[in-house]
Amino acid sequence: MSETTTAAKRVLVAEDETLIRLDIVETLTAAGFDVVGEAGDGEEAVSLALDLEPDLIVMDVKMPKMDGISAAEEILKEISCAIVMLTAFSQAELVERASDAGAMAYVVKPFGPADLVPAVEIALSRHTQIESLEDEISDLAERLETRKRVDRAKGLLMEKADMSEPEAFRWIQKTSMDRRLSMREVADAVIDQVAEQ
């Protein structure tokens, strides 16, 4: 098993054909994955996914009650996980719909362990990369917002307290350290206090 899956990733298998589902469970278990749930239709897949919050879902496209693509859309509205879609059809439209729904990989039946396991590992790896990028984007957005607020507070201090830009920055920085607050909290306090005047 690759380094992406060394911590026994939790997997939900959703496949309406029992024999295929059992084969998938056996293959994934043999590859070191922890199969935490099995679903026979799309609605059950959604319910189990929301209850179990697996790292990965291996799901058939064509299932009773709700197709796999619709189930994937419902699941990904609520939780973050990697999804591998299974299908007997390799139509471009289905592949595009699955991708738009958030599927990280697409495996065409019939398939064997040599097809499924790499697809699962790639899906998990891509999901980890995407989550890391989303965290980085969030962090950068937070830092940008902090910088904007600190700049605004500096401007207010320069205008209202007759400080130079370096003096205003040092005052915010020193106040932050002295009061054990973030620079953003100090900047917000300055902005709020000036707004009240």
Which residue ranges define each predicted feature?
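Two-component/phosphorelay signaling modules centered on CheY-like receiver
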Residues: 17-37
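Acidic catalytic/metal-coordinating carboxylates
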Residues: 41-44, 65-70
